[in-house]
Amino acid sequence: MNILFALHRLFWAAADWLYPPHCAGCGHHGERFCASCLAQVVLITDARCAFCGDKTSDGSSVCMKCNRNSVSFNAAASWAVYGGELRKAIHALKYRQDMALGAFFATFLIATIEKQGWNFDLVIPIPLSPDRMKERGYNQSELLSRPIAFYFQVPHSSMALIRIKDTGTQVNHTKIERDLMLKDTFYANPDKLNGRKVLLVDDIITTGSTINHCAKALKEAGTSEVYALSIAKTLKKDHRCSDETNKS
């Protein structure tokens, strides 16, 4: 842990001391995400397919059913299963400006990275469209990705990958529909990416379409490896009801 990461955590700890938070899960006063809600989180301890969410027998990030030539990322992992109190907390991070949750969840993502043993030299958040960024005022994925970059002491870039097409909401769309919506949506800057090993950070992986299209753009721009990471992963039965950010 380096000084930037320590200062980042200290900043949010001081903010919580000055303005005690309410739990983003149950509303309990005094904690950002209380121990009771944290205990209810279903951790992902086995390898799961980034597309359908099923367990993979060989420990890979894509199951045999979803294994296709169009898979562009090298590996993907999520900390927990999307649902319950965690779903409420991610909603607070994205839509209620509870930005301190970014630093909170980043600590669990760091542990996930260390478990995976990935080697990367650039951290990139999944980008929002200019309109969505203007509306929200911040990118929730960047609140996760920056402390990760601080911790591992690698560069961070929110401009190496940008969204150039407004796709509108992805909620209630299937993977096939999302793939069509996301085609040619992302642009990766070759000047910032040649030969890089990228860690791509998002809040939720639902059908895997977003991370796959981002990875495709990054690989076409010269990135050598792409690893995708998220707080949560939806299981296949939840794909249509997920409130995954319409990252437009």
Predicted regions mapped to residue ranges:
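Glycine-rich phosphate/pyrophosphate-handling loop used in enzymes and phosphotransfer proteins
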Residues: M1-D202, T206-S248
